[in-house]
Amino acid sequence: MATELLCLHRPISLTHKLFRNPLPKVIQATPLTLKLRCSVSTENVSFTETETEARRSANYEPNSWDYDYLLSSDTDESIEVYKDKAKKLEAEVRREINNEKAEFLTLLELIDNVQRLGLGYRFESDIRGALDRFVSSGGFDAVTKTSLHGTALSFRLLRQHGFEVSQEAFSGFKDQNGNFLENLKEDIKAILSLYEASFLALEGENILDEAKVFAISHLKELSEEKIGKELAEQVNHALELPLHRRTQRLEAVWSIEAYRKKEDANQVLLELAILDYNMIQSVYQRDLRETSRWWRRVGLATKLHFARDRLIESFYWAVGVAFEPQYSDCRNSVAKMFSFVTIIDDIYDVYGTLDELELFTDAVERWDVNAINDLPDYMKLCFLALYNTINEIAYDNLKDKGENILPYLTKAWADLCNAFLQEAKWLYNKSTPTFDDYFGNAWKSSSGPLQLVFAYFAVVQNIKKEEIENLQKYHDTISRPSHIFRLCNDLASASAEIARGETANSVSCYMRTKGISEELATESVMNLIDETWKKMNKEKLGGSLFAKPFVETAINLARQSHCTYHNGDAHTSPDELTRKRVLSVITEPILPFER
């Protein structure tokens, strides 16, 4: 019997309406003589500028999205009808999670499927309760004596939810020489579970480091002819990026399509996952329309032609940072800030002169609207748009929560612009910083700290003085995901930047500081990413100074960094894969299935 239609809104073709012409290839930065004529009117300023002078250009790819179509589309308002259906399905799944008679491994696999399918946020307290019962009843000790799969799965789930479990759980699967037993490689499911568990390691956990090497070496030896198409897809998916570092929505859509192929799939769980995915997608569409209207109203993309117009990519990034449906304010805030960051980064990196950049930095530090009188005309529009947007965000927070957050927002922007300015000085002076000097500035110029400051005030309901103090200091909760953001970004762009002779990049600075090859420097940067993840894992286990929703948001920023920069710079140069991902998360619903 066919199930009810779970598609809440019409699917949008990959090549129809939403896209403009295909994107051209990236062209290397070249100097040009630009005659710029801008005529801009806002409520507070109007100007006309004509200037002819040498300016650099990065020849960025143009925006490939049709904003008019986005603004004209309308989400199916019948979403309310589906909420009742979702509640009934949710109740059935909740009963399964809370079934105290369920076998340990059955329970663990159910929890794993719930989370992979994007439903974890619906069952947080139920999952925590089930894991509490699992531990208190001796479940962890029991599964470690029976199978590697059960041991690895329970280890990963427990660490993910803040339980302290020892890596020694894997000692029973090693021989007398301390090596993992060779016969384990015959159990592909167990090796996959071991691989995923190894990414929850802390600093100094050598057993898990060895487990990762062991699992990767055996998984890479497998072929589709040997293990079958379905299992090969799972292996390739895992090797591309481990589950712990994947963004939630992309993993959900992949897992739903993989799960529906299973003969023993839980149909109630699958139906809820599809319904939930499409319902949340309709929320994203509403959010995107709101943000798109703001972007059109601001008008920077049409006036500053030298800069990247990346609103859709910025919104997609924001979904990765805060995917839960209740965090619309966070998504809109982060998307707006990343759109500004992208354009202002191009001003500092490409277009502005050093004198102009110092003026702009001073204007942001002063946060005085009269500072626009000291700026060149193209900067006036940008500063005033930034000034009005941030003041509006601060006003809304004061109105809704009674907190004046403007000083914290403006400080974050001043810090970012100063970091941008330092990079511009290195470029203009043609100097190569040491790796430590570069990275001490670069993790801030990634914009990670700024985005997380804005995210904090959007997701945290009860703002605490201690949290504010640590927010301003860019506590480890903020700095470490920003480190990963910068390192992932630099890995994606290093080869191209080195070829152009640019010096300020993690890889190039590491090469010069250590006197090593690009290959070795790249490997070292990847190791830094792994070590940073171990520190973040430790903080999550040990408890954070910040509220849990913000901690998860910060970790998600690191995950989105992997997603965006894993196969190149998908923010600067979005390719076909990036566009497909954006569509799958934001516009294309998952079609219903047949029972």
Curated annotation (Swiss-Prot):
It catalyses: dimethylallyl diphosphate = isoprene + diphosphate. Keywords: Chloroplast, Lyase, Magnesium, Metal-binding, Plastid, Transit peptide. Dimethylallyl diphosphate binds at D345, E423, R486, N489. GO terms for molecular function: isoprene synthase activity; magnesium ion binding. Mg(2+) 1 binds at D345, D349. One of its GO terms (cellular component) is chloroplast. Lyase that catalyzes the formation of isoprene from dimethylallyl diphosphate, but not from isopentenyl diphosphate or geranyl diphosphate. Its EC number is 4.2.3.27. Predominantly expressed in leaves. It is an enzyme of class 4 (lyase). Pfam families: Terpene_synth, Terpene_synth_C. This is Isoprene synthase, chloroplastic. InterPro entries: Isoprenoid_synthase_dom_sf (IPR008949), Terpene_cyclase-like_1_C (IPR034741), Terpene_cyclase_plant_C1 (IPR044814), Terpene_synth_N (IPR001906), Terpene_synth_N_sf (IPR036965), Terpene_synthase-like (IPR050148), Terpene_synthase_metal-bd (IPR005630), Terpenoid_cyclase/PrenylTrfase (IPR008930). Mg(2+) 3 binds at N489, S493, E497. The gene is ISPS. It is found in: Plastid, Chloroplast. Disulfide bonds: none annotated. Pathway: Terpene metabolism. A motif (DDXXD motif) lies at residues 345-349. Optimum temperature is 40 degrees Celsius. It comes from Populus alba. Optimum pH is 8.0. Active from pH 6.5 to 9.5.
